[in-house]
């Protein structure tokens, strides 16, 4: 069962991947599946933040400080990106219940 991501969830990158910076954007390779995944500048900023475990609320606050974006849009886009990274098995999600 896929974990539900909320602002209280903690996310961190999976170990089975490698990534590199490409002129401010990021390219990620899932070592198990062999699939590449690309991130734009904002996505790359988020990727850098989650190299260590971070709460979604901390990531959102960092993005709001760095970029000119409405808080609701920021949260919706952040949750959508994290869900996509989770589905591609590039991140782990831990909720307060230990999931």
What are the residue ranges of the model-derived segments?
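Long, charge-rich, low-complexity alpha-helical segments
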Residues: 35-99
